[in-house]
A protein has these predicted regions:
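C-terminal segment of N-terminal export signals and the immediately downstream linker at the start
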Residues: 23-68, 83, 257
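Phosphate-binding glycine-rich loop
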Residues: 76-115, 129, 133
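Conserved PLP-binding catalytic core of the aspartate aminotransferase-like
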Residues: 142, 286, 295-329, 352
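PLP-dependent aminotransferase class I/II
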Residues: 52, 220-304
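PLP-dependent enzyme catalytic core of the Aspartate aminotransferase-like
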Residues: 325-329, 337-366
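Active-site pre-lysine segment of PLP-dependent enzymes
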Residues: 149-158, 173-193, 197-230
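PLP-dependent aminotransferase-like
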Residues: 108-165
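N-terminal export signals
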Residues: 1-28
Length: 366
């Protein structure tokens, strides 16, 4: 990223110039303040910094094309994604966010006789899409280490789709790469493994890996990605999946024609070409997250080891009153997850937002 774009990005974010190292979160003594009318939003695992400057410019320029259908832009993005992952274009399908990929997978491969198996807790949308297809949803609790219990999940009979969110939402935890490989190898060919890698870019553990390179060997593997997280485009909706062509064809049968919009396609294309934005975003998130975790631990709370842009705090008390009290203090945190009723999910925002979070959290939990 050149110096001009660094200055522009810093000004847009309102936090000064982008730097390789940032000042400690809690070294400053000035009182925190809310950055947004209505409170600080740490509830949806969004990227507080937004898209890269190049992506924002591309989306602005694409407004001149909104009178045209998106066919050419779709083809261009598919080509870029295929090249990125070293597959042919017929291995790629686009979606309005990775949520549409989940919906297409449920529609194509689950039914009243083919179940959807998922962890508990995990991202709930897959269960909703499965029920819309008339499929039974089987929930398997996470292990004590907050990993997917893949052996139990694979053992569910008549499974049409097994959904694995890795890193997992809402726990920010990972499932070991060796266990994932063994799981994929053990599945019958008529059971689809849908691996959701929405938070892939934030994971840096040596025990984690993307399974996209395994697609060529696994005819029953679908891998979902999104532009909503590290790329900062949650509001514009764009995602994709990688799978073998036979699966892509079945998913395309469930997809609306020309469902993508040219603005999102332009932003996604530019985002994939701006690798510096990803590197800087990961660095910012990691440093801010680590300092927040340290502050929370100093208050005596356990935090699930995080490989994402959010954390899960074990409050050892019912979480609903804390959620409500945090909101009353101007900080919106994650929703209640019934499988973990004493855990609080918190998105990692900007350093200033997280100072406000720590102050409010200390007050609420005192």
């Amino acid at each position: 990223m050149n110096e001009l774009s660094r200055r522009d990005l810093g000004r847009l974010l309102g936090i000064g110039a982008v730097a390789a190292t940032l000042p400690p979160l809690f070294a400053q003594n000035q009182p925190p303040r809310s950055l947004r009318r209505g409170g600080i939003r740490l509830s949806a695992n969004e990227n507080p910094y937004g898209p890269s400057t190049s992506a924002a410019n591309a989306m602005r320029d694409a407004m001149r094309l909104v009178n045209r259908y998106p066919d050419e832009a779709q083809d261009e993005l598919v080509t870029t994604i295929a090249k990125l992952h070293d597959v042919s274009a017929d291995h790629v399908i686009l979606g309005d966010g990775s949520s549409e990929i989940l919906k297409l997978t449920a529609a194509a491969f689950s039914s009243p006789t083919r179940k959807v198996v998922m962890a508990d807790p995990t991202f709930e949308a897959m269960g909703e899409y499965a029920r819309a297809s008339g499929a039974e949803v089987v929930k398997v609790p996470l292990t004590s280490a907050y990993a997917h219990d893949l052996e139990k999940m694979a053992g569910v009979p008549s499974a049409g789709v097994i959904y694995v969110c890795n890193p997992n939402n809402p726990t920010a935890s990972i499932t070991n790469k060796q266990n994932v490989r063994a799981f994929l190898q053990s599945l019958p060919q008529d059971t689809i493994a849908l691996v959701d890698e929405a938070y892939f870019h934030y994971a840096d553990s040596p025990d984690y890996e993307s399974v996209i390179p395994l697609v060529q060997m696994r005819p029953n593997l679908v891998v979902a990605r999104t532009f909503s997280k590290i790329f900062g485009m949650a509001g514009i909706r764009c995602g994709y999946a990688i799978a073998q062509p036979s699966l892509i064809r079945r998913m395309n049968q469930q997809k609306a024609w020309d469902s993508m919009n040219v603005v999102a396609l332009a932003g996604a294309q530019a985002s994939l070409l701006d690798t510096a934005h990803v590197v800087e975003g990961r660095k910012r998130n990691s440093q801010t997250r680590d300092e927040v975790v340290n502050a929370v631990k100093q208050m005596g709370y356990e935090v699930v080891p995080s490989q994402a842009n959010f954390i899960m705090i074990n409050l050892r008390r019912t979480v609903r009153p804390v959620i409500d009290s945090m909101r009353a203090n101007g900080v919106h945190v994650g929703r209640l997850f019934p499988a973990l009723p004493q855990h609080l999910r918190v998105t990692i925002g900007t350093p200033e937002e997280m100072r406000s979070f720590v102050t409010a959290f200390r007050t609420v939990t005192a």
